[in-house]
Amino acid sequence: MTLDLYGCDKKKLNDHELLFKLLDELPEKIGMHKFSEPIVHLIPPRENSFDRGGVTGFVILVESHISIHTFPADGFASIDVFSCKSFDSKFAEQYISRLLGAEKVETNVKRRGREFVKHYPKSIEKADAIAGR
């Protein structure tokens, strides 16, 4: 699932702690499992570039990953929730858009790897065992 969020609260888009919390809590809320703690970086503005800074973060999941890129000066955020497991994309969209105060959201949900998922049940059990669950 990809989300492009417009008209977001600019302070929230630059809030390292809030975005860490989003990446830390969302996986459990949508039935996924973190493989590692989230990593979140404040990105400073770059001279001679359209990039006026923001925050980039991601969390690696047993099921894949979630990433976020924010552009506070523009009130814009781009988020990917990539998973080899189905999840409630409507819930994820509403949770994220409310948290960031988005006025408009473009959502794309694409089913990928339909042949690969035949191997998934064994893989998730193995990954859970490795992660100590």
PLM features: residue spans?
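Polybasic/polar functional segments that serve as interface/processing modules
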Residues: 1-133
